[in-house]
Amino acid sequence: LTAVQLDLKKGLITFEELVQYYLNQIENTRDLNAYVEVYEKEALKRASELDKKYKENPESVGKLFGMVVAIKDVICYKDHEVTAASKILEGFTSLFSATAIERILHEDAIIIGRVNCDQFAMGSTNENSIYGAVRNAANKNHVAGGSSGGSAVAVQADTCLAALGSDTG
C-alpha cells in the first residue's frame, strides 16, 4: 500500500488508472474463478471521486487511499448481492454494510468486487460453491484452499491490493 500511495502522491498514477489496471487483471484471470461479481462502474466512479478529492486537498484522503479491495461473498455490503456461495441466498441484496466495509470505505478504500468462497464459508478447499471451484493461480490443477480461497487468489493473481476474508474456526 505504501508504494501505491507514494505513486499516487507523485502523480505517477491516478486512482482511475489504478482501478483500471486491476479491472484488466480480473478480466485476464477469469479462468481462476476468484470473482463472482465485479463492481466495475462503481469502482471507477469512486476512483474518479478520489482523484478529484486528492487533487483538491491531498490531506483530505483517508489512511487507505489507493487500497483496492475485494470482499468475500459472506461480507455484507449495503445494496449489493451477498449469497455466501449458496443457491438459497441467490438474489439476496444486503440491507446494511458490515462494520469492516464501513471502516475501509470511510478511509477511502475502493471495493472492486465480490469474491468466491466455500458455501457459507464452511470448507477448506473452496470447491463447494454455486459458482464452482476457485483455481490456484500458481497451479490451476490445485485448489485455492480455505473457505476464503477467492480472497486469497484475488490477491495472488494481482487483481486487487487486498481482500477481506473470514475464519469460522
Regions found by a protein language model. Give the residues of each.
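Short glycine/serine-rich loop segments
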Residues: 96-98, 102-169
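Conserved hydrophobic/aromatic pocket- or pore-lining residues that grip, position, or stack substrates
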Residues: 22, 43, 72, 104, ...
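Immediate post-signal peptide segment of exported/extracytoplasmic ligand-binding proteins
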Residues: 50-68
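Enzymes and membrane/adaptor proteins characterized by extended Gly/Ser/Thr/Asp/Glu-rich
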Residues: 30, 63-100, 124
